[in-house]
Each structure stands twice: as structure tokens, then as C-alpha cells.
Amino acid sequence: MEDKMLLYIADQMKHRIADMEDECPKLRIDIANLYYLSGMKAMGYSDYATSRSYFKVALSLLPTDRWVSQYKLCRHISLKLAKSIYSCGDVEEAQSILHEMLEKCLSIEDKLPVQALLVTSE
């Protein structure tokens, strides 16, 4: 999918996100993946404010038990969200996400990139 098309679809779907609370969990995960990819594209353009927005929407679409049922996706989104937020200059919010990640990550390998970003943000 072309970058512009992906970002266009994500932007159009934002208008309906609030209505998605009762949608099928699988659909919500698929849309969270779309927003994750959109956030990655925005990061690739160094548009951290936009990537921050996409990653926040992606995280909001995951179920409340996201650290159990969607561990890998949640970890990826959370780390990219923290990087985007940090790049926007909101160090405290980024650190808050990183501290939550340290509590939730299951392995040392998963915690290493979190620790690395946390060290650079302090």
C-alpha cells in the first residue's frame, strides 16, 4: 500500500474511532495495526506529532488486557509512542510510558530498548 494512501485511510478512520467500542475485537486489532503502520510511516518522515497521534489511537484500540492478549503489538506501539512523545519534547509523558513498559515487559530483551530510551531521556 502506498504511504499516502495508508495515511489517508488512517486519517479518514479517525472520525469513526469513537464509535468502535462495540466492534469486533479482531477488527479493532486490525485497525490498531493500521494505525501502528501509519505511525511508523509518519516517524519515517520525522513527523513525530502525527506519529504520536497515530500510536495513541492504535493503543486505544487494544483491549484492556492488552499486555496479556496483545503483548507484542502493545510493546511495539508503546515503545514507538514513547519515542514519538520524547521527540515532541514531552519527556515526562514519555518516561511514564517507559516506566509502565518496564513493569509489563516479560524479558530482559524486551526491556533493553526501553531502558536505553529511558537513560537518554533522563
Q: What feature does the model see in each segment?
A:
Residues 1-93, 97-120:
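Extended alpha-helical scaffolding segments used for macromolecular assembly and cargo binding
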